[in-house]
Design a protein with these regions (language model features):
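Long, domain-scale functional regions
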Residues: 1-277
Length: 277
């Protein structure tokens, strides 16, 4: 549904009231018995650090930021998907193997965990992330249902350096299919991207896709056409692929432990859900 209309806001990482914007998360969905959250706004270097795959502040991309929904632009950090570990691999374009990514291992699964605090990290469970991805025509140019099948159910290991389609960790990023399913249901027939027709892809769904935030951001999914392409959402709202050394915005995603309970809140941005132990 539309950006602020879906009442799926959760306050996470603080007991401060009212909940600071930087602690707002949103419920992507319930998968089996696991609730999946994603950070509402893009991560800062204070949250994810200036080591790992940090490149620079997002404003230094000199990108189109006119679609950005919030007012925190100057603090948003931009990270490569997998570049700093080996800056010469694949002619310097980075690698699309998630298990070797410092964004994964340092920024998300070390710094985020340390900065969010023990009490809150205990509310997050380790999960199996589907990281094989698939080739361009099986995800980017497909509607949500087909993209989900090719991304989550039948990922591939083509061109990966570890021949794995799964990675176990607490923190990850959204899937392409998460983004696509966040739009109103009648938009699920759209392709992630159709090169010359915005009316047939997710550019025409931004006003009714609550996951769309207006900046260029990474997903967790490889584009398995080569060793260095990764799927991302661009500022116009469509799904594309780019080199893993590119530096984009980040929104950490994770699954809550079954022991976490609902305390209060209606789920609106101003009255987010408060969690208990």
């Amino acid at each position: 549904g539309a950006h602020d209309v879906v009442d799926n806001f959760v306050c996470f990482g603080t007991d401060t009231k009212p909940c600071p914007d930087d602690n707002l998360y949103r419920i992507i969905g319930v998968f089996g018995d696991k609730v999946k959250l994603i950070k509402y706004d893009y991560a800062t270097k204070e949250l994810l650090g200036e080591d790992g795959d940090y490149i620079k502040l997002y404003t230094e991309r000199n990108d189109n930021t006119s679609n950005y929904y919030e007012n925190n632009l100057v603090k948003i950090a931009a990270y490569a998907w997998n570049y700093k570990k080996d800056m010469s691999i694949n002619n310097g374009y980075g690698s699309n193997t998630w298990s070797t990514s410092l964004l994964n291992k340092i920024n998300l699964n070390t710094n985020f965990i340390n900065n969010i605090g023990t009490n809150w990290i205990d509310k997050i469970i380790e999960t199996t992330w589907k990281v094989g991805g698939n080739i361009h025509v099986n995800i980017e140019t497909q509607p949500a249902k087909v993209a989900y099948q090719n991304e989550i159910v039948n990922p591939v290991m083509t061109y990966s350096t570890d021949n794995q389609t799964e990675y176990n960790a607490k923190i990850g990023l959204m899937y392409v299919s998460d983004y696509m399913y966040a739009a109103l249901q009648d938009k699920w027939i759209l392709a992630g991207s159709i090169y010359n027709d915005a009316s047939k892809d997710y550019r025409s769904a931004t006003s009714v896709n609550w996951l769309y935030m207006g900046l260029v951001e990474w997903t967790i999914s490889r584009c398995a056409n080569n060793e260095n392409y990764v799927f991302y959402v661009n500022y116009g709202g469509q799904v594309n692929a780019t080199n893993a050394n590119n530096y984009l915005a980040i929104r950490p995603a994770f699954y809550l432990s079954n022991s976490v309970s609902y305390l209060s809140g209606s789920g609106t941005k101003t009255d987010p859900i408060i969690l208990g132990d």
